[in-house]
Each structure stands twice: as C-alpha cells, then as structure tokens.
Regions:
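Histidine-centered active-site microenvironments of extracellular/periplasmic hydrolases
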Residues: 28-123
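Extracytoplasmic/secreted proteins, especially bacterial periplasmic and envelope-associated proteins
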Residues: 6, 10-13, 17-24, 97, ...
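Loop/turn elements at helix/coil->beta-strand transitions in domains of secreted/extracellular proteins
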Residues: 34-40, 183-185, 200-203, 246
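Long, internal low-complexity/basic segments
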Residues: 1-4, 53, 143, 148, ...
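Beta-strand elements within well-structured catalytic alpha/beta cores of enzymes
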Residues: 15-18, 22-25, 29, 38-47, ...
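Anion-binding catalytic surfaces of enzymes that hydrolyze or transfer phosphate/sulfate esters
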Residues: 1-18, 29-37
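Glycine- and acidic
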Residues: 2-11, 127-132, 235-236
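C-terminal cap/loop subdomain of S1 sulfatases and analogous C-terminal strand-loop tails that border
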Residues: 84-113, 126-136, 140-225, 229, ...
C-alpha cells in the first residue's frame, strides 16, 4: 500500500509540473497580448496506462520486455521514485481508478477507459461561447479539420506537385458555437492490438482479441458487445443479445470500409457496397483483421 500510494503521488506531481509548464505558455501569451487571439487545444492521447503491470514498475521498459516488477523491487527504490534513477509507472489498478467511471485503460480501443479523453479548446476572439461544456462525439482526427475551418483554410490538393491525401475527420466548428448543432460525424473506428471499437450514431460495438499467442483464436470467434453509448458511457449494459441487427449493422460498416481500402490499395476505384456511407471516418482501420 505504501509503495502504490507513493507511485500515484509521484504521478500526481508529474501532472502538476506539466500543468505549470502549460501555465507558463499561457502567461507568455497573456503578457504579449496574444492570448485571446490564439487557438489553444489541450488533449491527451489515450486513457490512463496499465503498462505498470500489477505491481507498478521502477522502469517502464521492463514491461515492454515482458518483465513484471515485484513490490519488493519497487520498495527498494521507494525514495528514488520520480528521480533520475527511475522511469517508474504506477500499478494497473491505478489506471482503472484514474479512468473511472470508464472501463479498462490504454491499449483497449474497445472501451472508453482506453480511448475517452478530456479536450479543452480556447479562442476568445473567435469563439463566442466561453466556459461551456460540449457532449458531441469527436475524435482526435477531427482537430485539424476544425482548426482549418475556424481559420477558413482549405487544405491544398497538391504540395509541390504531389497530391495530398484527404484529411480524416470532420470539423466540429459548429458545435463550438451551438451545442445542439450536428457536426455531420456519424462513424468512427478504433483498433489496437486486437481490440476493436466501432462508434456509429450513438452506438458502440466492441470486441477484444488476445494480444499474445497464448490466447489466440480465429477472429471469427471473437465475442462482440453492443452499447448505446450515448446513454451508457460506462459500457455497463451489453445490448448485443437484445439488438443483434444493430450489432451487425455496425460490423457491416467496418467490413465495407475495409473492402474500400483494399480496392484503393489495388488501384480499383469503387463505391462502398450499397452506396457511399455519409460521415464515415476511415482513420485507424488498417490491421483490423
């Protein structure tokens, strides 16, 4: 208990230090008179990490080499945690707690604990709404289109004669001014190390595939869950048995996008089966099978 509490305390210190550095940037912008004229976006890349293992670690690189630290090892470094002699990481239990009320943690693209993050956006001169909360579903791939939209910039089709790939994502500029305005985003896919998630119009289908050979089986054997995540953000009520058609609808979206990407990769231009799917985001679909 003493070790685990100290590991969380060190992480809290890191967060406080990071917050102070962001404060230095804001102070400079304020002193230079540019704070109100600067678009600021603050996000993190995933939920809290479980890479400390069950006992935490004094050196996170051990985890990536398959070595699980013991509590006894951690206690030897208790007074050095957070210093230059350690690269410590809190235990996996803290990851679960830090992500409350969401399930699981970083690496799980199938659950909100792995993919849900807070986002803070500020631009006093360009956004009339101040200090308000938005509940619109957005993804990190929507940030760049939104910034372009705020600045009335159209991304170039070519750069120095080289054709550019179209941006993934959908601008949510309208939601910054009007919380009830639709952004046009309808679908988002997630995948990481066998875990997969499909968000579509307030519903979320997910499954977990074992990341290591010990638990491998055919992908067709994976058990899918279904949540009405717009009303059940904690993914507590699996509705797969109650709404099997809805589950298959979401899985079909993924299959259609995979087919389209294969056509694109082989130079075969073609529409999605059954016609185009509006508002779909193809980001991070590679490697789903």
């Amino acid at each position: 208990k003493r070790l685990f509490a100290r590991m969380a305390e060190v992480f809290a210190g890191f967060l406080s230090y990071t917050d102070a550095q962001i404060g230095r940037i804001l102070d400079f912008l304020e002193e230079s008179g540019e704070l109100d004229n600067t678009i600021i976006v603050v996000i993190s890349d995933n939920g809290a990490s479980g890479e400390g293992g069950p006992n935490g670690s004094v050196n996170e690189t051990k985890f990536f080499n398959g070595y699980i630290d013991t509590a006894e090892e951690g206690l030897k470094f208790l007074d050095r945690l957070g210093g230059p002699q350690t690269y410590n990481h809190y235990p996996i239990g803290w990851a679960m707690a830090f992500n409350t009320p969401y399930k699981l943690f970083k690496r799980y693209a199938s659950h909100e604990g792995g993919i849900a993050d807070t986002a803070i956006i500020s631009w006093p001169d360009g956004i009339s709404a101040h200090g308000e909360v938005r509940d619109n579903y957005v993804n990190v791939c929507d940030i760049t289109p939104t910034v372009y939209d705020l600045l009335d910039i159209t991304p170039p089709a070519t750069v120095r004669g080289i054709a550019q790939k179209p941006l993934d994502g959908v601008s949510f500029k309208v939601a910054l001014e009007n919380p009830t305005a639709p952004t046009g985003k309808e679908t988002q896919f997630y995948t990481m190390l066998g875990t997969r998630g499909i968000w579509h119009k307030g519903w979320f289908a997910n499954t977990v595939h074992a990341a290591t050979p010990a638990g491998w089986s055919h992908f067709d054997a994976d058990r899918w869950e279904l949540f009405h995540i717009e009303a059940d953000r904690s993914q507590c009520h699996d509705l797969a048995a109650e709404y099997p058609d809805k589950l298959e609808e979401l899985k079909a979206l993924r299959d259609e996008v995979k087919a389209l990407k294969r056509q694109t990769a082989t130079g075969q231009a073609g529409a999605l089966a059954g016609g185009a799917v509006d508002g779909i985001v193809v980001a991070r679909v590679d490697g789903l099978d």
